[in-house]
Amino acid sequence: MILGIDVGSTTTKMVLMEDSKIIWYKIEDIGVVIEEDILLKMVKEIEQKYPIDKIVATGYGRHKVSFADKIVPEVIALGKGANYFFNEADGVIDIGGQDTKVLKIDKNGKVVDFILSDKCAAGTGKFLEKALDILKIDKNEINKYKSDNIAKISSMCAVFAESEIISLLSKKVPKEGILMGVYESIINRVIPMTNRLKIQNIVFSGGVAKNKVLVEMFEKKLNKKLLIPKEPQIVCCVGAILV
């Protein structure tokens, strides 16, 4: 059995696979700040239930897994993981905490081309997280907030966009409308990236893909359905195992 560990900026994902089948997985709400001894302890707990033959690491905080047998770059892992879940995929959108990645892949999941957004852009998972903090919206309640009145957030920079959110709140603009504006801001940063790579069958991976309202807006803007795995947060981890 192979254990994959994907240490992201905000979450850590672990997946156990045998003969290309997912046996077990877990998602922890702690990312790159996780200590290596904590990771080792988690691995030892898994080893009490399953025999681990090999450990592979990926993600923004992959350096925290120095005990891994193999390190796989995120972009390569994402392509392979997307292909595992949807073999018709020719593209991937991954909105991570630190950046947004858009990939063009071939029929084997090999990355042909990719674009990374600026980590300072108002289009990352971290920006969405910060917006939720300002709006005092629990991330677990996020799908309850929806509105047809979309507030305009025009800044390309996350810091200035956050200032716009505070300004809109002070003007008594409803939270729902501001949140929809945040979604639109994120989507508007990603669509030019997908257009540039000319991708059609797109896998949406990462925690943001669990946001039903954002996905609905995204699909409307793209005029197509996105391919979303049952658990979109483990795509990169699965791909790292399969590389």
Curated annotation (Swiss-Prot):
<feature type="binding site">
    <location>
        <position position="120"/>
    </location>
    <ligand>
        <name>[4Fe-4S] cluster</name>
    </ligand>
</feature>
<dbReference type="GO" id="GO:0046872">
    <property type="term" value="F:metal ion binding"/>
</dbReference>
<dbReference type="Pfam" id="PF01869">
    <property type="entry name" value="BcrAD_BadFG"/>
</dbReference>
<keyword id="KW-0004">4Fe-4S</keyword>
<dbReference type="InterPro" id="IPR008275">
    <property type="entry name" value="CoA_E_activase_dom"/>
</dbReference>
<protein>
    <recommendedName>
        <fullName>Uncharacterized protein MJ0004</fullName>
    </recommendedName>
</protein>
<keyword id="KW-0408">Iron</keyword>
<dbReference type="InterPro" id="IPR043129">
    <property type="entry name" value="ATPase_NBD"/>
</dbReference>
<feature type="binding site">
    <location>
        <position position="157"/>
    </location>
    <ligand>
        <name>[4Fe-4S] cluster</name>
    </ligand>
</feature>
<dbReference type="InterPro" id="IPR051805">
    <property type="entry name" value="Dehydratase_Activator_Redct"/>
</dbReference>
<keyword id="KW-0479">Metal-binding</keyword>
<comment type="subunit">
    <text>Homodimer.</text>
</comment>
<keyword id="KW-0411">Iron-sulfur</keyword>
<dbReference type="GO" id="GO:0051539">
    <property type="term" value="F:4 iron, 4 sulfur cluster binding"/>
</dbReference>
<dbReference type="InterPro" id="IPR002731">
    <property type="entry name" value="ATPase_BadF"/>
</dbReference>
